[in-house]
Design a protein with these regions (language model features):
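Non-heme di-metal
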Residues: 1-152
Length: 152
């Protein structure tokens, strides 16, 4: 939140921070749920195993965000993701990769916004951003190894 908004009586910094953390929490939790659903539909055990490993990472990130939100006095809303997109493994992998990239973009945007005012939250978001960056090659591997013409 900018200085002018604070001077004019805009929303509190804590409320805005919590709202953004909740958005990030929802994105992490939704990604984890979708990756597990994708793993259940995977054609090959090694793909399912890789997707479940990615889901574990996303669940851990959602847990870190949940703890931070609760520590700030915020509440955790239920997460009800939209249906899993894609008609085959390749389409689902592409959707998951795009969602991971979009989630990372928002994380770094939030981290840089909150850095001077909320360093603990900014460090947490930057840490999740970095860890998500390490997983992008796994998403790419699933996309590359999937047949775009195969049917489920």
């Amino acid at each position: 939140m900018g200085l002018l908004a604070r001077l004019l009586g805009g929303r509190s910094t804590e409320r805005d921070l919590i709202a953004e953390l909740i958005d990030d929490y929802r994105a992490e939790a939704t990604q984890a749920i979708h990756l597990r659903q994708h793993a259940d539909l995977a054609r090959y055990p090694q793909v399912a195993s890789r997707l479940r490993a990615l889901a574990d990472i996303e669940e851990r990130h959602a847990g870190l965000l949940r703890e931070h939100i609760l520590g700030l006095g915020g509440g955790i809303p239920p997460v009800s993701p939209p249906p899993l997109a894609g008609h085959n493994q390749w389409e689902r992998a592409v959707v998951a990769r795009k969602a991971a990239a979009e989630k990372r973009r928002r994380l770094i945007e939030h981290a840089t916004h909150w850095d001077p005012e909320e360093p603990t939250a900014a460090r947490l978001l930057a840490r999740i951003y970095d860890e998500d960056g390490e997983t992008l090659s796994s998403y790419d591997d699933v996309v590359i190894r999937s047949d775009p013409h195969a049917l489920d």
